[in-house]
Amino acid sequence: MSKLLFLSLALWASRSPGYTETALVALSQPRVQCHASRYPVAVDCSWTPLQAPNSTRSTSFIATYRLGVATQQQSQPCLQRSPQASRCTIPDVHLFSTVPYMLNVTAVHPGGASSSLLAFVAERIIKPDPPEGVRLRTAGQRLQVLWHPPASWPFPDIFSLKYRLRYRRRGASHFRQVGPIEATTFTLRNSKPHAKYCIQVSAQDLTDYGKPSDWSLPGQVESAPHKP
């Protein structure tokens, strides 16, 4: 399939009402995906490595990107650790662009070369990593939950996150959810003394761009300080 046809498909997809950030790939090509867990510092992209048929040689990849679907726009290298790497990084994200990024991943193997294209808007693929350091403090019937923003989220004071909690008492079959919460602490009232709880936290961009993170690891109860 020619690059011109790929570009035509990408332009059509980006203008269609049901447009999502889905790779436009030739038959038997890897599906390329990108996410912005480090917004706005970078967008990270990855794809499934290919093994050329009847060959022991590994496939190498050339990854480039540009802002906009027009072919006359200048392409830049998507940063890879090596030609065989199956992931790359787009640095210095252009914020709130009205045109999509176009990522072109070309697989080069002994049988030839073929390309896959992915069109995306950076804000639509924001997905923070899970919050970190979730911990629990008990005080009678109150259970305080504390956590930190994901370390990979570079500017939490500027590009703020909001959080949701889910919790259940040991033995319960369903989680209850609380949120959204803009602080990094929340107190559950009327908790059962001495009961054990599974509590997890999820993060999302404050302005609802993209998707929520996966749930964090369950919170750990802090040890009471030793009295001298």
UniProtKB/Swiss-Prot annotation:
Annotated GO MF terms: cytokine activity; cytokine receptor activity; interleukin-27 receptor binding
Q: Does the keyword Secreted apply?
A: yes
A Gene Ontology term for the protein's cellular component: extracellular space
The places in or outside the cell where this protein is found are:
Secreted
Pfam families reported in the protein's UniProt record:
fn3 (PF00041), FN3_IL27B_N (PF24031)
Per the record, the GO terms for biological process are:
T cell proliferation
Domain Fibronectin type-III: from-to ranges: 26-124, 127-224
Keywords assigned by UniProt, alphabetized: Cytokine, Glycoprotein, Repeat, Secreted, Signal
Q: Which InterPro entries match?
A: FN3_dom (IPR003961), FN3_IL27B_N (IPR056621), FN3_sf (IPR036116), Hematopoietin_rcpt_L_F3_CS (IPR003530), Ig-like_fold (IPR013783), IL11/IL27_subunit_beta (IPR053073)
Give the glycosylated residues.
54, 104
Signal peptide segment: 1-18
**Membrane spanning stretches:** none
What interactions and quaternary structure are annotated? Answer: Heterodimer with IL27/IL27A; not disulfide-linked. This heterodimer is known as interleukin IL-27. Heterodimer with IL12A; not disulfide-linked. This heterodimer is known as interleukin IL-35. Interacts with SQSTM1.
Family to which this protein belongs: Belongs to the type I cytokine receptor family. Type 3 subfamily.
User: What's this chain's function?
Assistant: Associates with IL27 to form the IL-27 interleukin, a heterodimeric cytokine which functions in innate immunity. IL-27 has pro- and anti-inflammatory properties, that can regulate T-helper cell development, suppress T-cell proliferation, stimulate cytotoxic T-cell activity, induce isotype switching in B-cells, and that has diverse effects on innate immune cells. Among its target cells are CD4 T-helper cells which can differentiate in type 1 effector cells (TH1), type 2 effector cells (TH2) and IL17 producing helper T-cells (TH17).
Please identify the protein, giving its name as recorded: Interleukin-27 subunit beta
> Which species does this protein come from?
Mus musculus
